[in-house]
From Swiss-Prot:
It comes from Citrobacter freundii. Transmembrane segments: none annotated. Plays a role in the bacteriolysis. Is activated under conditions of high osmolarity by the factor sigma S. Entericidin A functions as an antidote. A lipid is attached at residue 22 (N-palmitoyl cysteine). It is found in: Cell membrane. Pfam families: Entericidin. A lipid is attached at residue 22 (S-diacylglycerol cysteine). This is Entericidin B. One of its GO terms (biological process) is response to toxic substance. Residues 1-21 form the signal peptide. Belongs to the EcnA/EcnB lipoprotein family.
Amino acid sequence: MVKKTIAAIFSVLVLSSVLTACNTTRGVGQDISEGGSAISGAGTKAQQ
């Protein structure tokens, strides 16, 4: 019984960590994309 409880708690902690990592990765990807768009826009303005 104790082992099942510990395993359940551990599983919840691992799952929450994985979900947090996914959201963090998505946020980093969006930040990089926005940075690339800003650089592209600056390059276009410089060419004009």
